[in-house]
Structure formats: C-alpha cells, structure tokens
Amino acid sequence: MSWSILELIRNNPEVLKENLKRRFIDTSTVDKAVELDKKWRQTLQEVERLRHEHNLISSQIPKAPKEQKSELINKAKELLKTLEDKEKELQKIEEERENLLLSLPNLVHDSVPIGPDESYSVPIRFWGKFKVYKDDVNEFLKQTNGHKVDYEVINWKPVGHADMLENVLRLGDTKKAGEVAASRFYYLFNDIVWLDLALLLYAIDTITSRGYTLVLPPYMLRGEVIKSVIDLDTFKDAIYKIEGEDLYLIATAEHSIAALYYKEEIPKEELPLKLVGVSPAFRKEAGAANKDLKGIFRVHQFHKVEQFIFSSPEDSWKYHEEMIENAEEIFRGLGLPYRVINIASGDLGAPAAKKYDLEVWMPAQAKFREMVSCSNCLDWQAYRMRIRYVEKNNKKGYLHTLNSTAIASTRAITAILENFQKEDGVVEVPKVLRKYLETFSGAPKEYIYPKKKPNTTS
C-alpha cells in the first residue's frame, strides 16, 4: 500500500478493484472508501467555509460599533461551536477512511501468477540432485512441472524427519514438551542442538559477508507498531499477545527490524540499508490445526535468521532478486536440493506485492516443503510506519521494505534429517557446517549417530 492508493481511490478506483479481484477478495471495500473520501472532501469544504466565516466575523468585532459587537460576538461563538462539531465529524470520517485504506492489501506485481491458492504458484527454477524413492518417481516428476532436473532413484524408503529425530536418533522429545508446555513445542538434545546453532552461525556468516549489518532485535513489539508491519486483524490468531500488556511476541525478526526506523526519515543517499536479524520466532499456528502434527517442522517456537532491506523505490526489485539469491546460496552450500516458486496472487499476504518461496525436496514425504519466504512489500509497511526517505532537495517519499528468510533452524534440520540420512540411520553433517562445530569437543564433526534417548526424568 502507498499514499498513491488514496490517489487511486479518487482518480482510478477500478485499479484497486482489479487488484482485489486478482487476490480473490471482495471489492466492496473500495466502494466504501470512495464514498468515505467523497464525504471527507465535502466535510472539509464545510469546515473551511465555517473557519473562513468565523475568522471574518472575528476580524469585524474590534471595528464594529458598540451596539453591534454583542451580536457579532454571539454569532462568532455559535460559528465556533458549529466549527468544532464539524471538525470532530471530519476527524471521525478521516479515521474511518484511513482504516479502510489500511485494510487494503498491496498492489500485486504484474509478474505474479494469478490464482486463488498455492496450487497456482509457479516453479521457476530447480537446483541440486534430488533423492527419490523408487515408488515416488511419478509423483516427483509431477511436481517438477516439466522442468529438466537431476535426480537419483533409491531403493530404500527414507525415514521421516519426526521418526528420525525421536525414534532413530532419539535426540528430541515432543511428547514431554507437549505435557509440560503444549503441542508443537519440543525438547532437543546434544547433536541436534549443535546443528541448530551451526545453522544460525552459517546463515549469519553468509549474509554478513555480503555487507548486511547484524541485528539482535527486541522480541516483543507494541500493538501500534506490529499492526503497521503486518495485517494484525488477519494474523491476530497467529501472534502471541502478552496478557494484560500492549506487547506482542514477534513471529520473525522482520517485525522488529522493520520498526527500527519507525516514524523516522532517512536521507535517500544512505539507502539501501541492509540488515540481518537473528531471533526466536513465536507463532500460534492456529490456522494449521491438522498440519504437521509430528516433529519440529511446524512449531510454536524456533530460531530464525532474517534478511531485511530498506530500499529506494526504484531499486527494490533488484534487491528482491538479491535476497532470494542469498537464500539460495545458503541452501546450495548446505547441499539441500530445492525449487524456487513464484507465489500465486491468492496466496500472497497483504503486505507483499510479490513473494518467492524456496522449497526443499523432502524424500520421505515425497514433496517440496517451504524453507524460505522472500517478499517485496514496496511501501506498504513504510506508509503504515511513516518511514520516509528525504532527497537533498528535501523532496520526501515512502521507501520500500523487503524481507527474506535466511534460515529457519528447525525446518532446515528436518530437511537435513531426510536428505542426509543413510540407510543405517546415520545422518551426515553438511560439510559447510563443520567449521562452526570443530572447536567444540561435544559437537558432532561429520556424522550424527543413532543414540539412546536421554533420561529427562529425575
């Protein structure tokens, strides 16, 4: 969204209606916004007329004959009361109009495939050699959408990541975590914890080497702030709120980093500002009640490294490609085979004008699973957060914001468990992670071996 959306409401509302149609959203909001804006402009004219009339009469009072002063004073008081009431009405209409405008999603980029759900998303490239169980070859080829890919057929069925974690390696315990916390929480032990830490360090190392500033952000934000970063009405069931306080736990470092320049102006010559944040991520996952019930793929709490860029409007599409390339470099380094997909319009979140997902092939599940989301939000977030750039001639405008996952540790672990396992249950540690583990005596060096489950009872 941008301030230009108000211009479209006034001059070309059909563009906004078409955008909502492309997102498969009801268009009545645009009609309501048009009517409210018309009412706002009419009320503004009335306020200006009353203000002018009040000022005119007030200016006549000192010069008026004594017998007319009392009448003019009373008339000025009546006008002032009418003006104050009309100004309150104007403010109320403006707030209603602003809330409607803020409810509108971003304008979909022309390169986004049009469709109501994820099934209309389009794979645009594949990387790596895919390990495919012999009975899953046809299903795999269907998911390549006709792209030429390199794959290896294996005769043994890989074990799913949940069973690998808890029953083969015995390095996780979701049952006990569910007992003492809730479902979708977990205990991890020893080698898997080291793997989690190594993944974070590897992602941070990769992104900071490209000139991004490392950030450790707040893990909570005030309601006013977080609703300017995301569509809180839509995602209120996904975000944890602290009871009795106006604070929300972040679902990603994107939220806190986006707010770093809340209500500030940035000299345009300082753009782009490239940052990479590391933080825990907290998610209710209320909309995923029956999805991924086992293991650590979809959980309430995990560690995440997030890329973020504040960009000038003319450069944001260039940086969108840069950020997905950074993410791809991380997964190429890990040796995890993946595809990049262009997300369909109906599956875009409200802030994004375009989004790429990077999905890794999971051989035990015979499907691709999301590891990375990379979005260009244009000025949708910046307008809400009042973050503007300032040119040397003092011309101002809303900058663009972009975000992308670098690594979500638990999801990356599930991908490693399925892609790097051997038939005997041993899991190879990706070579690129080993340098982050070699100095620690207790960390795995090359392989993670099946072990007995740690004793968690006293």
Curated annotation (Swiss-Prot):
It is found in: Cytoplasm. Catalyzes the attachment of serine to tRNA(Ser). Is also able to aminoacylate tRNA(Sec) with serine, to form the misacylated tRNA L-seryl-tRNA(Sec), which will be further converted into selenocysteinyl-tRNA(Sec). It catalyses: tRNA(Ser) + L-serine + ATP = L-seryl-tRNA(Ser) + AMP + diphosphate + H(+); tRNA(Sec) + L-serine + ATP = L-seryl-tRNA(Sec) + AMP + diphosphate + H(+). This is Serine--tRNA ligase. The keyword Cytoplasm applies. InterPro entries: aa-tRNA-synt_IIb, aa-tRNA-synth_II, aa-tRNA-synth_II/BPL/LPL, Ser-tRNA-ligase_type_1, Ser-tRNA-synth_1_N, SerRS_1_N_sf, SerRS_core, tRNA-bd_arm. Homodimer. The tRNA molecule binds across the dimer. Consists of two distinct domains, a catalytic core and a N-terminal extension that is involved in tRNA binding. The lineage of its organism: Archaea, Thermoproteota, Thermoprotei, Sulfolobales, Sulfolobaceae. GO terms for molecular function: ATP binding; serine-tRNA ligase activity. Belongs to the class-II aminoacyl-tRNA synthetase family. Type-1 seryl-tRNA synthetase subfamily. L-serine binds at T252, A253, E254, E306, T405. One of its GO terms (cellular component) is cytoplasm. It comes from Sulfolobus acidocaldarius (strain ATCC 33909 / DSM 639 / JCM 8929 / NBRC 15157 / NCIMB 11770). Its EC number is 6.1.1.11. It is an enzyme of class 6 (ligase). Keywords: Aminoacyl-tRNA synthetase, ATP-binding, Cytoplasm, Ligase, Nucleotide-binding, Protein biosynthesis. Coiled coil: none annotated. ATP binds at R283, K284, E285, V299, E370, M371, V372, S373. Pathway: Aminoacyl-tRNA biosynthesis; selenocysteinyl-tRNA(Sec) biosynthesis; L-seryl-tRNA(Sec) from L-serine and tRNA(Sec): step 1/1. GO terms for biological process: selenocysteine biosynthetic process; seryl-tRNA aminoacylation. Its main location: cytoplasm.
